[in-house]
Amino acid sequence: AIYAGTGQDGSNDVDVAALTYAVGPVTVGYQYTEIDREAAAAAGAADSERRQASIAFAINDNLSVSYGIIDTKLDGAANAVDEEITGMSIGYSMGGMTLNAHHNEGENMGGNALNEVEHTEISLSFAF
């Protein structure tokens, strides 16, 4: 599937193009987003270009895994470095129970070379 859109978010111009492709148990996706901030130069904010890619694999009816990356280039901000985010997840379901886990890491968040984040979450849910 191919998706595209353009519009405004307040005074920001936003353009998006994305595609997904599924074959058998594998799905891959790619998205490109560009944000042109009208007041970027005056406020010290940055325009941005974001590229996202992912792959998901359904190992069987109950177990699936996925991996994704996001690279964001910040244009115009003083001393800004590119953001890099990676994440992976796994999900297992059996009857009414679902166990999910994911781990994400971000480097240079907000264009700051000293800003790194990490998040891990495990959840268990039951449907009655």
Predicted segments with their positions:
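Outer-membrane beta-barrel proteins
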Residues: 1-128
